[in-house]
Regions:
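All-alpha prenyltransferase/terpene-synthase fold signal
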Residues: 1-172
Length: 172
């Protein structure tokens, strides 16, 4: 009977995690963000709201949904899943801001790809919107907020903390 209960719960979690990722990939998630990105190529600049929406959906949903799905499959407490949802959004935004910084400040040798791609395509990004100093400050602020959320979980989040710091400190 206990194995049957576990099997049912495990199956429910797999379905819930799958739904989380599927929803994140759909029109209200990554696809929606990509549509905004494509449409933005016709505009000179994006508003701050459009830029955040695009990256929260395009990049952020990939990161957020992966973290939430992992928490679901790991049978985390519902309160922790809700906190990890917010953590994932903030981490996704920090990741994208850092990516925009690296596009301007990084080297081709370290990145393994061409830099200044957004500038070459005349695309809006966080650096063009806020400038380098503000973007660096935003990365640090979002990282601190992420760590604060992780400190508030009911489980040890050592590896997520390590990931968070690595994303801030990355050079590629």
């Amino acid at each position: 009977i206990l194995m049957m209960d576990y099997s049912l719960k495990s199956g429910e979690n797999v379905l819930r995690a799958s739904k989380e990722i599927a929803n994140a990939a759909g029109a209200d998630g990554m696809i929606g963000g990509q549509v905004v990105d494509i449409l933005s190529e016709e505009k000179e600049t994006l508003s701050e709201e459009e830029l955040k929406y695009m990256h929260l959906k395009k990049t952020g949903e990939l990161i957020r949904s992966s973290i939430v799905a992992g928490a679901i499959l790991g049978e985390a407490k519902e309160s922790d899943i809700e906190k990890l949802d917010i953590f994932g959004q903030k981490l996704g935004l920090a990741f994208q801001i850092k990516d925009d910084l690296l596009d301007v400040l990084g080297s081709v040798d370290k990145l393994g790809k061409n830099t200044n791609k957004d500038e070459d395509k005349n695309k809006s990004n966080f650096v063009t919107m806020y400038g380098i100093d503000r973007c660096e400050d935003l990365c640090k602020q979002l990282t601190e907020e992420c760590i604060s959320i992780l400190n508030d979980l009911t489980v040890d989040a050592k590896y997520l903390k390590e990931l968070t710091y690595n994303l801030l400190d990355r050079e590629y």
